[in-house]
Design a protein with these regions (language model features):
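Positively charged n-region of N-terminal signal peptides that target proteins for export
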Residues: 1-5
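Bacterial N-terminal signal peptides
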Residues: 7-17
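Sec/Tat signal peptide C-region and signal peptidase I cleavage site
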Residues: 18-22
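Transmembrane beta-barrel domains of Gram-negative outer membranes and organellar outer membranes
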Residues: 23-264
């Protein structure tokens, strides 16, 4: 029932915003001179990178979960703008290192992922909306890889509330391989972002994942991002689990940069 509800919601959102693509689009096209990243929030950016741009988002994360301590990096997401409202996305294999000597998740590289993102907004109500589809390939170490071809769909959105406050969120549906079966998982997020100064903002975020098998995973997430220049960004974030199935806590840092030099 939960999976059907998430699927219906995704279809409804995509169907509802698709007819609005031609309305007031210029208002929310990303400025070609300013970086706008997916990280460090769970909620992805609701806009694409500018056409001809290459953006790399990187970071390191330390996670404590059910007695296991794991670090991973470099969390590299490559985003390439192929059209004014379309980007290609490549998630490089991430290396996981289990700091515990007994049991738990093994160490090694994760799977490679390819995706595409299409900007659908802004809508008449002032919402920016995008749709993301992706597929992972079982290229990682057997101790880390799912061993399957895993797909997913995400619909991030955002809306400015005032000159300094923005609300955002994302509805997602994933089909991860666990063992020999799929554990279809719905996820929803809600984020409030506050711009402290022109280049510096902070956020608080809730993220909930709801798998068909296993308990729900509720997270409370805090973070900040500082633009060192228009095309360079540092970030820092921490999160705590609110349910027994979620990670106990995690902490991460990141650095992202934008190349704006490709012309057609």
């Amino acid at each position: 029932m939960l999976t059907r509800n998430f699927t219906s919601l995704l279809v409804f959102l995509l169907a509802g915003v698709a007819p609005l693509r031609g309305q007031d689009q210029s208002a929310s096209v990303v400025s070609p001179s300013t970086i706008a990243t997916d990280r460090p929030a769970v909620t992805n950016s609701s806009v694409v990178v500018p056409a001809g741009s290459l953006q790399l988002e990187n970071g390191f994360l330390e996670t404590d979960s059910q007695g296991q301590s794991i670090i991973d990096g470099p969390e590299t997401l490559v985003r390439f703008g192929v059209a004014s409202r379309t980007e290609l996305r490549f998630t490089a294999p991430d290396y996981y290192q289990n700091l515990n000597s007994t049991g738990g998740l093994g160490s090694g590289f994760s799977d490679f992922t390819v995706g595409v993102k299409e900007q659908l907004g802004p809508t008449r109500g002032g919402f920016d909306v995008s749709a993301i589809l992706f597929l992972s390939f079982p290229t990682g170490a057997h101790t880390v890889s799912s061993g399957g071809y895993d797909g997913g769909a995400q619909v991030p959105w955002s809306r400015s509330l005032t000159a300094k406050w923005t609300a955002a969120g994302m509805f997602s549906l994933y089909w991860p391989t666990q063992g020999r079966t799929r554990n279809v998982t719905g996820q929803s997020t809600f984020e409030l972002d506050r711009q402290l100064t022109g280049p510096w903002d902070v956020f608080v975020e809730y993220a909930g994942s709801f798998p068909e098998r296993g308990g729900p995973q509720h997270l409370l997430h805090f973070g900040t991002a500082l633009k060192l220049a228009k095309r360079h960004q540092l970030d820092f974030h921490v999160g705590v689990g609110l349910s027994s199935a979620a990670a106990d806590h995690f902490i991460g840092v990141g650095y992202s940069f934008l190349f704006q030099g490709f012309r057609r």
